[in-house]
Amino acid sequence: MPYATKKPDITGTWLAHALWPLFLAVFLAGSCEAFAKTQEPKMPKIASASAIVVSVPIGQVLFEKSADDVRPVASLSKLMSAIVFMESCKQVDLSALHQMNSENRFLAKGGDHSRLTTNWSYSHLDLLKAALMRSDNRAMPALMDSCGMRLQEFAMRMNMKAQELGLKNTSFSEPNGLSQYNVSTAREYTKVMLEASRFPILNQIMQTKKDVITAWKNGRSQKISVGNTDVLLGRKGVDVIAAKTGYTDIARYCFTILNRLVDNSTVAMVFLGAEGKHTRFGDFSRVHKWLSERMAEYFADEQSAVEFGT
């Protein structure tokens, strides 16, 4: 067999691209002693209270700021809720309808205005869209209801999943994130994002900038436009695999994203406790620019090494 006798050429740039996530981790983490002696990479200035950037699937931390501080995660909680729904409610037909009721409305109390009207019916797929795109707080309680679970059981499933993922500082008391007791750390929530991204339907929803859902009542239908709260969707140079925003007065502005870079490597980012609505996206842009600059420097050096045979 040719692979048993022919030694691969490790000087080609193809190998550098194949192993880029590992090289990036070494390059940015400062574990390359020679690089550390000659030049210290300028780290991005992040305004969020805590943040982390992790290479996927290696798991190497490329950047962190107070990443182990336990903080409320607001509507980032809906990622865990979606995971529990997908895993524990497989019997629920996504095309089937659920009629919004007063309990669904009650569990959304204290959140933003909902577009989902009581006594109207919505498909479970449309409820997922409302929850993950617009972050509607009536959608997850409705999905929980269709799954046949009460609040206490659903929250218990969320916490069991957190334990399964090895998250020691993550806990939930309800599905939306309105409670200050829905908490985690930036470091741990990268694992929640990665777990949610295992479901293609969730990724597809989170990659959608705008959509239309349908409300049904007594044979009548009404179309409702749903926009995504992630302003990075459609931005040039930003390839979103999955993302979720969150906000409460206590948690402040939060954001998590799984982002594919230009060389097809992937990074997971979490930003918690940003004071301004757009600060979390500004933090992403600063990190994204930093990664791109480091990437360009690395491949320029790699190409020079190949050309000069070093």
Language model segments and positions:
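N-terminal secretory signal peptides that target proteins for export/translocation
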Residues: M1-T13
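Bacterial N-terminal signal peptides
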Residues: A18-G30
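Active-site-adjacent loops and short helices of periplasmic peptidoglycan-processing enzymes
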Residues: A36-R187, K191-P200
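Penicillin-recognizing serine hydrolase domain
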Residues: Q39-A49, N119, H124, G148-T310
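Glycine-centered signal
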Residues: P2-Y3, A29, E33
